[in-house]
Regions:
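Predominantly a Rossmann-like dinucleotide-binding segment in NAD(P)-dependent oxidoreductases
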Residues: 1-77, 131
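Beta-strand scaffold of nucleotide-dependent catalytic cores
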Residues: 5-8, 96-100, 123-124
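Glycine-rich beta-alpha junction loops
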Residues: 10-16, 70-74, 91-93, 101-103, ...
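Glycine-rich phosphate/pyrophosphate-binding beta-alpha loops
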Residues: 49, 75, 98-106
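Substrate-positioning beta->alpha
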Residues: 50, 77-84, 89
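Glycine/proline-rich active-site loop of Rossmann-fold NAD(P)-dependent oxidoreductases
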Residues: 61-62, 77-79, 93, 106-110
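Acidic/polar loop patches that form or flank catalytic/metal-binding clefts of enzymes
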Residues: 62-68, 94-95, 120-124
Length: 172
């Protein structure tokens, strides 16, 4: 549908650490910001790993090398809370991974776009029932679950008619 993969762009933005990070007492009492409890990484170890996995899973290509620029705000807490990563994947495909837990106002914004030589795909975790497909001719298509235009594999995983959010059936 999109042809040969040429570019991948994934971001995972949250804002939950923003009100905590500016208060020294809260900073020191939050386990995610404590390297003895959380390990050597905060943002990348927490959500960056999910974004990284999304790149490899979605494209089917392995990351072969990367260059990361990680950010912390206070000398007394050098856990990364934000970062940008340049990716090189198999076949020379380039990508960008951006993750932040100080993106003010963001909730759980995982988003991936994969661009090929004939089109592109975009999916957002906060709008999981929509897959955006762009093509060379400029047409934007929006795919949602439960429609006959979906593949047999997709239809086999859908329990309800179009318009029902996936997972609601299981939650009730």
């Amino acid at each position: 549908a999109i042809g040969k993969v040429q570019k991948v762009d994934v971001q995972y933005y949250q804002g939950w650490i923003n009100p905590i990070i500016h208060d020294k007492d809260k900073r020191s009492s939050t386990w995610r910001l404590d390297p003895t409890k959380a390990g050597i990484s905060c943002c990348m170890g927490d959500i960056g790993t999910h974004a990284f996995n999304m790149v490899e899973y979605t494209t089917g290509l392995r990351v072969t090398s990367l260059l990361a620029d990680l950010n912390y705000l206070y000398e007394d807490n050098q856990m990364d809370i934000d970062g940008n990563v340049l990716l090189r994947l198999q076949g020379g495909v380039k990508g960008v991974l951006r993750a932040s837990q100080i993106a003010t106002g963001e909730e759980n914004g995982l988003k991936i776009s994969v661009y090929g030589d004939r089109g592109g795909l975009t999916w957002e975790q906060e709008n999981p029932n929509r897959l955006l497909v762009r093509s060379d001719d400029g047409a934007l298509q929006v795919y949602t679950p439960g429609h006959s235009y979906n593949s047999a594999l997709s239809l086999g995983g859908t329990k309800l008619p179009p318009g029902h959010p996936e997972g609601i059936f299981d939650a009730m």
